[in-house]
């Protein structure tokens, strides 16, 4: 197992490139869309990218050994107006994996998620050697949960869901 995550493994502010969305850029979050843009689009939204992002490797399918460009998984639409959640954070993909050979923790993590998790991948990939992300709502791959746990050498499973949003797809994925 991976053991306990040491305090020294928690990334610090200086480990990231920080920026604020808002101010000169309008940020249209999902909640604002749902409420017909009733909220300000000028709020400051923190955005951080690991300083070593160029050293991270992104994979789109289980078992892939050829990495894909970061923009395949993480939005790159900061030049849009307004900027949306998908322009800044990860897309709602059924599966992706991020490898960080220089991570302070050698653990491999599986995240079962909905869109609530999209903003956290850069932070988590700065900590763990491997972060495998599955969104059961759009997961189209062959490996079931047990196979993923084995194939990716998972040490830790995390659930990232909006409050009260446990989906039928998650239950089916866990039951398969």
Where are the regions that the model predicts?
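Extracellular glycan-modifying ectodomains
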Residues: 1-176
